[in-house]
Amino acid sequence: NLNFRKVKLKKLKNVPAYSWLKSKKIRVSGSSNLEIKFSINSSIKPNKELLVYRPQKLIIGIGTVSGASYVKLKKLVLDTLENKDLSIHAVKAIATIDLKKNERAINKLGQYLNKPIIHFKASELNKISPQLANSSEYVFRTVGSHSVAEAAALVAAGKSSKLIVEKNKSAEATCAVACLSLIHI
């Protein structure tokens, strides 16, 4: 479970890290028991006493065959997030290899999620080959990188990131999820 932390609202005064909250003009009485929880997990649900903030910390790495089905790719991604208890609202971006810039399914997924798609050259993805949970000689021979989904997610998420969902695959696509540093919310 990757929950961040609980914060009592009345303790937020003069805390710069929570300036996003002040700008939202949320009115709460001084005696309120409203609690704020930072979480990327979908199982944490808001209620009248709990405000759930979903920091955008997840990068979805995607690899597909040419002409992959958008419906099947979307199902793979949504099922992966659901099965790992990850909130779609915590997704920051989609990452893939530059050879997929014109891949309809990936571009439609970016539109559906309303998230940017980050493209990397195979040489950039290969720089992190030792960190990968799964690498493939077949993928290397095909696109020039030992991995697309895992590598793209990790490269996009940055140096202090962690792969939290290894490559999950269907007949036409792969996806993996990396989490940006949990330290900086």
Show which residues each predicted segment covers:
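Internal helix-turn-beta structural module
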Residues: L132-E172
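Short, solvent-exposed coil/turn elements at secondary-structure transition points
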Residues: S123-L125, K169, S181
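Conserved mixed alpha/beta catalytic, RNA-binding, or beta-rich assembly cores of soluble enzyme
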Residues: N1-K101, A105, A178
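Conserved small/polar residues in nucleotide/adenosyl-binding loops
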Residues: I183-I185
